[in-house]
């Protein structure tokens, strides 16, 4: 089936039923869509890697949005800075994405209890945008109440899904603990046994949320950890099958009964676990790249010509030569972006996402 039969919008930011169809297609064809964290010019490097070939998720976190806007010197009370910058990023991505010939899911990441005002503000923007364009500004949002009780997590997530549902907007929720540290939630010291979500929680989430809307996914704990693994983390994607098998009789459903799963912690995982996760359950895999992939590129333009960088007038041997080109931050940043783009390609290969758009786009 070609993408003309699958998606109503062929390129650019997709929403609603197109997001649902894309994730369904990923499940049926055993690939996961890489979700790439972007901050600024990293948006272009992610799109560059996927150009004409692969669907992609572009997402920003509260921390990244605040970082991009904190230079304004204004208070972030009520998440005003993080909210306004995330909204600005959404408009920027919407303007750029169609040029790359691929479907793009526009997403915001995490959002703990203390950051809910950020989500509230973005939903306000979604509703305003929807009145004008009959679709939300963002394709999807995430709510991460994994630090709270399971009951409050599910109850609050359901409330937000009810708000998003009329816009056919996707909501990703986290249940259980993802190790490491991300966006102000620190689970670096938790016991490994705490990194696995219980089947009964998944079942309760599915029953509760599916009664409201089909536009949701679950970021469950399968031993995954944010950041670079140290070799002592055991990913257990087969737990997904145990979740489904335990409740298959109650649901009596021939299709995947427990919805769509998201794999967090893809940045530091080796290729084999990431590929295994994809083949077992994930329709989306989150990869936080800008922290890891920028450095090799930018540092190569600092370490190698370090003598030139000591003075804009050149090294002592060539006193009258202008070496200002070595100081151009655009050159350094571009080298970092090239490395990031290559890392995005690795993630697409790991998640079996490479050339999926070409498979979907036969023209």
Curated annotation (Swiss-Prot):
<feature type="binding site">
    <location>
        <begin position="265"/>
        <end position="267"/>
    </location>
    <ligand>
        <name>dihydroxyacetone phosphate</name>
    </ligand>
</feature>
<dbReference type="InterPro" id="IPR006411">
    <property type="entry name" value="Fruct_bisP_bact"/>
</dbReference>
<feature type="binding site">
    <location>
        <position position="226"/>
    </location>
    <ligand>
        <name>Zn(2+) 1</name>
    </ligand>
</feature>
<dbReference type="GO" id="GO:0008270">
    <property type="term" value="F:zinc ion binding"/>
</dbReference>
<feature type="active site" description="Proton donor">
    <location>
        <position position="109"/>
    </location>
</feature>
<dbReference type="InterPro" id="IPR013785">
    <property type="entry name" value="Aldolase_TIM"/>
</dbReference>
<comment type="function">
    <text>Catalyzes the aldol condensation of dihydroxyacetone phosphate (DHAP or glycerone-phosphate) with glyceraldehyde 3-phosphate (G3P) to form fructose 1,6-bisphosphate (FBP) in gluconeogenesis and the reverse reaction in glycolysis.</text>
</comment>
<feature type="binding site">
    <location>
        <position position="144"/>
    </location>
    <ligand>
        <name>Zn(2+) 2</name>
    </ligand>
</feature>
<dbReference type="GO" id="GO:0006094">
    <property type="term" value="P:gluconeogenesis"/>
</dbReference>
<comment type="subunit">
    <text>Homodimer.</text>
</comment>
<keyword id="KW-0456">Lyase</keyword>
<feature type="binding site">
    <location>
        <position position="264"/>
    </location>
    <ligand>
        <name>Zn(2+) 1</name>
    </ligand>
</feature>
<feature type="binding site">
    <location>
        <position position="174"/>
    </location>
    <ligand>
        <name>Zn(2+) 2</name>
    </ligand>
</feature>
<comment type="similarity">
    <text>Belongs to the class II fructose-bisphosphate aldolase family.</text>
</comment>
<feature type="binding site">
    <location>
        <position position="227"/>
    </location>
    <ligand>
        <name>dihydroxyacetone phosphate</name>
    </ligand>
</feature>
<keyword id="KW-0862">Zinc</keyword>
<dbReference type="GO" id="GO:0005829">
    <property type="term" value="C:cytosol"/>
</dbReference>
<dbReference type="GO" id="GO:0006096">
    <property type="term" value="P:glycolytic process"/>
</dbReference>
<keyword id="KW-0324">Glycolysis</keyword>
<dbReference type="InterPro" id="IPR000771">
    <property type="entry name" value="FBA_II"/>
</dbReference>
<feature type="binding site">
    <location>
        <position position="61"/>
    </location>
    <ligand>
        <name>D-glyceraldehyde 3-phosphate</name>
    </ligand>
</feature>
<dbReference type="Pfam" id="PF01116">
    <property type="entry name" value="F_bP_aldolase"/>
</dbReference>
<feature type="binding site">
    <location>
        <position position="110"/>
    </location>
    <ligand>
        <name>Zn(2+) 1</name>
    </ligand>
</feature>
<dbReference type="GO" id="GO:0004332">
    <property type="term" value="F:fructose-bisphosphate aldolase activity"/>
</dbReference>
<comment type="pathway">
    <text>Carbohydrate degradation; glycolysis; D-glyceraldehyde 3-phosphate and glycerone phosphate from D-glucose: step 4/4.</text>
</comment>
<protein>
    <recommendedName>
        <fullName>Fructose-bisphosphate aldolase 2</fullName>
        <ecNumber>4.1.2.13</ecNumber>
    </recommendedName>
</protein>
<keyword id="KW-0479">Metal-binding</keyword>
